[in-house]
Amino acid sequence: MKTSKFIVTLLLTLMVATGAMAQSTDNEKPTIVFVHGIWADGSCWTNQIAALQAKGYHVISVQNPITSLADDVATTQRAIDLVKGKVILVGHSWGGMVITQAGNDPKVAGLVYLAAYGPDSGESVSAVSANAPQTELSKYLVPSGGYVFISEEGVKNVFANELSPKQQALVYATQTPASHTVFDDKSGEPAWKQKPTWYVVAKNDKTIHPDLERFMAKRMNAKTMELASCHVMMLSHPAEVLKVIEEAASSKNLKR
């Protein structure tokens, strides 16, 4: 009899403890995984990383090789694999192509697109841009050894045109060029069809036309806001970008 009571007590204790652990896990802040775009690198998120870490978030900034969409998705997947709980993926520009596919991982609870590509299944950057208004970006691109760089003038005039000369020089020096083939890499099934999605349109964007951004945001049925910013909004408007990320991370609509 005493043995039976002990077992019942032990089981009840374990049930309570397990429930408490589950509740604790559910209440934990998601890990924020940043995915940069072409002509940037993981350091472009420095402002947001520092602010989020100060608020108790775990943060990972992916370093994409931009050799192919598959390579970048694999790089992002390795970052997701490091995380035990929920993940919010934040993609800028080309990074949107990456999170659209990597976001299918079950750990990913939400997606944040910042002036980013949001392809449908089978779409490439070239395809989704084909019928959109064009910018002057192409005249500032510099091919070299099978990769595409952006010129110093391009950084100043269309990519990071709202930043100080010192910041622009840093952006130019730290850029990650893209393999010339990535613009035709096709996306797989998009995660935005299944996951809560946020989109920030850069109203002053001279790299991706704002109307194309609006089209993609509407197609995703994303919660959308517009920011009077150039393409690299995480550098030109760090506080506003941080606010959107925190909104996504604290949303009650995150995928469980």
Segment roles from a protein language model:
Residues V8-A17:
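Bacterial N-terminal signal peptides
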Residues N27-L69:
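Conserved HGGG/HGGXW glycine-rich cap/lid loop of the alpha/beta-hydrolase fold
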Residues D71-V87:
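Conserved acidic catalytic loop of the alpha/beta-hydrolase fold
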Residues V90-G95, I99:
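Gly/Ala-rich beta-loop-alpha elbow adjacent to hydrolase catalytic centers
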Residues K107-K156, S179-V182:
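Flexible "cap/lid" loop of the alpha/beta hydrolase fold
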Residues A173-K193, K203:
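Active-site nucleophile elbow and catalytic-triad environment of alpha/beta-hydrolase enzymes
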Residues Y199-V201:
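Short beta-strand/loop motif that positions the catalytic acidic residue
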Residues K203-S229, E240, A248:
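Conserved loop-alpha-helix segment in the C-terminal half of the alpha/beta-hydrolase fold
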